[in-house]
Amino acid sequence: MGIWVCNHSSYLSIKTLSLNSTVCLLSSESELKLRDHRVTEMQNKKQKIGWHVFIEGAPHCVDASLVSQLGPNLSYARQSPGINLHYLRGFTERAESWRSFEELDTFFRHNGRENSIAKYVQAHWREDWFFGYQCQNGCNPLMIRQTRLIPPNMAVTSDMLRPFLPETSTLEQELEKGTIFLLDYEVLEGVPANVINDRQHYLSAPLCLLHLDQQGELKPVAIQLQQNPGPQNPVFLPSDPVCDWLLAKMWVRCADFQCHQLASHFLRTHLLGEVYCTATLRQLPEVHPLFQLLMPHIRTTLQINIQARASLLAPNGVFDKAIGCGLASLPAMLSRSSARLSYRSLCVPDDLEDRGLAALPRCYYAQDALRVWSALHRFVLRLVELYYHGDQCVEQDTELQSWIMEIYTHGFLQKPQSGCPQSFQTMMELTKFVTMVIFSCSALHAAVNFSQMDFDLWMPNCPASMTRPPPQTKGTVTEDNLFSFLPEVNSTCSVLITLSMLSVPAADYSRYDHTHVHTVHKFLSSSRCHCVSTGSRSSAPAPPAGLWRKCRQNSGPLLMTSLTGTGN
């Protein structure tokens, strides 16, 4: 292999290796000139690529403010918006509330006519079973967890929930059996709400208990809209007036929207993805096997995040003008969410075990995520075994050890309690971490991003903000004024335009070394088996949000065509 010398351009650049190029570890470099070149390459990259603190207490980002600084190999082409937005004319300037659900329905019919899942959401969003279904299989399946104890700050009693449990059972027995689940949005406690259209909007930090019934359906049984119990913070129940109960669920869905966008989506996949990408560029030479393995999955994160910070998360962007938590609350939300982040929560088998999701027979996200993780893990292990011939090779790879320390420092902010490794001692430790990186930046991102239009297109199902404060008493809400809590017309349009743009995958993929084709074919084989297994869910109560259907739109092509070189 000839020596490739980087020119002194002013942008960050990576080079895709040709099909007959050599990929190797530093210890395998036999030519002194090549070893010296690796050192020189990394010195040059570290001078060009630096770190920047975007928000104190959150993962760091690349020190670049313009996409033009990235160069052609770290940017990508975006397809046109996925839906026709001409119908928004006449709506985008209306800084007023929706007049009725009928007006919303007319608006939606223009918008959702080609989205069968969105139509299904509109038809069933009021139903308790569908509320529980979304917690498991919607665009944010990362909040639900099994609980064996009622939170001490939730004013729920056994007698209160008795009508919603099996006839011969008690709350204590259901907790012991593992059929009680919890949504807790305490990260929103005390977060100031946004001012939109010169009007104060409102947030809540609800707690919601759900029960897995004998038919296998997960249904909400109690909702408390604020963290601190008291006479002005009642516990809403399914037996309450219909509009009271529906409004309580809408408040939960609004809180979920905030946590989904900033924690599940932006933090876990985008910000951490940027950390993985920046660390890879700074610490791994382009002939390192992990550079070649990881870069197809992470290279677009820099462009996406730079654009997000310059538009979506900037003054006059959608977070400033249309989202309940707003720009002023961004530091609190991201720093709090980062403090709660752990390495275990990013690793699918550990996360599912910790949240007790194996007990949910219709949690298709859990089932699919575990299968995709397992296939990815086998795939990564085979690639690791191609280049590392034992644990000692892992320990002695100084480039690899610098890479993981950089991630620990700038991604997990040197917090030992995060559980992020500071070094790798074994091939299995390395395989697990690399699997996590690929899963987070491909399959997980597909699950929390590409299903947004399915579940958020009917806005009352996932309101981005609320224009009236949470109710402090029961019996004050009617069908006629329920919609008055929802965001204004123009902010609704802003959110939908943004979600439409975010729901479109990148258009280009890379071609890579044919050395890996045999390993990739094994991965494809296990992936196809999984696609077949998801087809047996016709008895499910709703179209499965199945991770794999979403994964095929983004991580499927990315995992498969980029490594085999068979894509467009």
Residue ranges and their predicted role:
Residues 1-568:
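Long, compositionally biased charged/polar stretches
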